[in-house]
Amino acid sequence: MNNSGLKIIEQPSPSFDARPQGMPIDMLVLHYTGMPTGEDALARLTDIEHEVSAHYLIEEDGRIFCLVAEAHRAWHAGISYWRGHKGLNARSIGIELVNPGHDFGYRAFPEQQMVALEELAIDILTRHPIPSRNVVGHSDIAPTRKNDPGELFDWRSLAHKGIGMWPKRAETGPRNVMDALKTVGYETLDYSRALAAFQRHFRPSEVQGIADPDTLCWLQGTVELVERMG
């Protein structure tokens, strides 16, 4: 599974299949469970009738469960798109963070949980060629369907630990907002929801799907960061 010293609890899920031959593992997708308790989430993710899973689940107290081996395709992303690729289960590792979500009392992610995520993510990144711009949330890759891990998730702190990216705010916005969102990686069939997904990740203080000046400056800063990455 991995070669690290992390304490990981094996809780196998039957909901997985083979990755396409030769497909790189070059994405890390973060979710929240969106269920009342971690026990509820673990039960669903390991129940074949629901046909949903992730590679890992992290409880609020920091316990890490491995549900699907990284070599296999877990079923967590659903209909998804990022940087020209679709069907992202094939190329990603999925981590579920226990959190009630917006339907059951959304709340901040505890420190123990975030520390466990940082340790697990760093371990994953040492073993797979995942660029920082491919560390994303479920809402980034499915903006019309999902809003997790949501506006309370601390992407900035994670990026400062070497997991994902965080831009500097530009002084002006992009010339074309749609093109800018595409450059970052978003599918823009629904412009407002794509912009809201960007806000959840990079400007979470106000998520309304409207191109206000502050959002545009953060968007331009993200474009500039992505372009420097090549």
Spans of model-derived segments:
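Active-site-adjacent loop/helix surface patches within enzyme catalytic domains
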Residues: 1-133
